[in-house]
Amino acid sequence: RRVPSGIRLETSVVLPYCQGMIDAGMAEEVEEELRLALGRDWQPPLLRLYAQIQLNDAARQLLSAEDWLGPHRDDADLLHILATLALRAGHRDKARAYVQRSLELQPTAEACKIVGDLLFERGDYVAASTAYRQGMRLAAGETADQADIEHALLILNPPPAAEPATPNPL
């Protein structure tokens, strides 16, 4: 059931093997194989494939993926995947932080969708619509309006409220 050891090191073999296993409903069986492959050969297609796996323990999968932050802290693909996994695990605050950093590094349609979903979930339909629209622009190969993305992120992560001024007792 595992990739034979002689060819396990070849990403060109691991990728279609794992994709086939995921398609066959055997994703949990290849999760470790994908983690090992990513440790040997950091490739975006392997990372995206890892995100397709939906383990019963989503929090464990998120923790495993967060281990990659050390060497890949500024990898927009990883941050997007972490946002997706955080949502699956029910960690909305982590998802917001990861997707925000991902968008700062490289705006993508998928990241805009996550922002839109988070805003929609909060009931901010206008801002969600803006995020979705920017994602559609990116998916169509157009340039996103950075100001609109920043506005949606600001709504998603408002700055802390200033402390009210205390009256001078004099």
Indicate residue ranges for each PLM-predicted region:
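Start-of-helix register in tetratricopeptide repeats
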Residues: 12, 45, 77, 110-111, ...
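Solenoid-repeat scaffolds in large eukaryotic assemblies
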Residues: 14, 27-30, 61, 78, ...
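Alpha-helical junction/boundary sensor with strong preference for TPR arrays
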Residues: 3-7, 41, 57, 69-72, ...
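Alpha-helical linker/edge segments of TPR/alpha-solenoid repeat scaffolds
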Residues: 53-68, 123-134, 141-145, 154-170
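Alpha-helical adaptor scaffolds
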Residues: 32-104
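TPR/TPR-like (Sel1-like) alpha-helical repeat modules
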Residues: 31-44, 103-107, 119-144
